From Swiss-Prot:
Coiled coil: none
Protein name in UniProt: Small ribosomal subunit protein uS8
InterPro entries in the cross-refs: Ribosomal_uS8 (IPR000630), Ribosomal_uS8_CS (IPR047863), Ribosomal_uS8_sf (IPR035987)
Record-linked PROSITE patterns: RIBOSOMAL_S8
Gene label: rpsH
Entry's Gene Ontology cellular component terms: ribonucleoprotein complex; ribosome
GO biological process, one term: translation
Family assignment from sequence similarity: Belongs to the universal ribosomal protein uS8 family.
Record's subunit section: Part of the 30S ribosomal subunit. Contacts proteins S5 and S12.
Source species: Chlamydia muridarum (strain MoPn / Nigg)
Record key words, sorted: Ribonucleoprotein, Ribosomal protein, RNA-binding, rRNA-binding
Length: 133
């Protein structure tokens, strides 16, 4: 796996492509930030589960994707908001409601990576990483 400057965009793109190809899982290089994002996706039912494994002295994360009974992906869209070239920060009051509360916003806050409603409840803002619905 090559080095990318935006590992979050890489994660979202790999998930998007794997869902279109109806793959069961993806493998991606592990980082604490990516694990926190995938953990939030799992808590909200967007991915089935994930595990972290070490292979050839590299830590990899295997993310198992989730599909409905009709083999349609549970995730309809993933959108990267804040990018290395253009950071987007929001206050707690400006955290977006995604797709009529059917989706989630993922933020990097001083209290760690949080989902939008959790950050709103804690009255904390931060960098708006991505939107998922």
């Amino acid at each position: 796996m090559g080095i990318t400057s935006d590992s979050i965009a890489n994660l979202l793109t790999r998930i998007r492509n794997a869902l279109m190809a109806e793959h069961l899982y993806i493998d991606i290089e592990h980082s604490k930030m990516l694990e926190a994002i995938v953990r939030i996706l799992k808590q909200h039912g967007f991915v089935a589960h994930f595990l972290v494994k070490e292979e050839n002295r590299k830590r990899l994360m295997r993310v198992f994707l989730r599909y409905g009974e009709d083999r349609r992906p549970v995730i309809h869209a993933l959108k990267r908001v804040s990018k290395p070239s253009r950071r987007v920060y929001v206050s707690a009051a400006k955290i977006p409601y995604v797709f009529g509360n059917m989706g989630i916003a993922v933020l990097s806050t001083p209290q760690g990576v949080l989902e939008g409603s959790e950050a709103r409840a804690k009255n904390v803002g931060g960098e708006l990483l991505c939107l998922v619905w």
